[in-house]
Amino acid sequence: MIKAGILGGGQLGRMLLQAAANYPVETFVMENDAECPAAHLCHHFTKGDITNYEDVFNFGKGLDVVTIEIENVNEEALQKLEDEGVKIFPKPAALKIIKNKISQKEFYKKIEVPSGNFVVTTSKSELHEHSGFIPAVHKIAQ
């Protein structure tokens, strides 16, 4: 039986577990909240911090595959797990790109994925300089 871990136990984690119920998969979830939506559907629940290197590494080292249900996870620990043979989805390199919204938008532009125009600002004065860039959505990079 495949041992599959999910980092994060929110609604997406719960939906992943519901789909996994149709397959020969032993499920593991790590989340800081023991009452999260996914906690009671998995075979094994671990209370832990998905942003903490040691928690993520220790959670994943005995598993066959690890995935995420939220992007705010420790990608360094995921990279170490992948280096040691655990299958990680999405790949830690991809996660590093999608975690930072500036990197994500620049990557989309580079590979010509249709995406809205954007301006990167790093200060209040730069934000004022681009006040005519409307409509706009303002996001923190990471």
Spans of features found by a protein language model:
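ATP-binding N-terminal substructure of ATP-dependent carboxylate-amine bond-forming enzymes
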Residues: 1-99, 103
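Active-site nucleotide/adenylate-binding loops and adjacent lid/helix of ATP-dependent enzymes
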Residues: 95-142
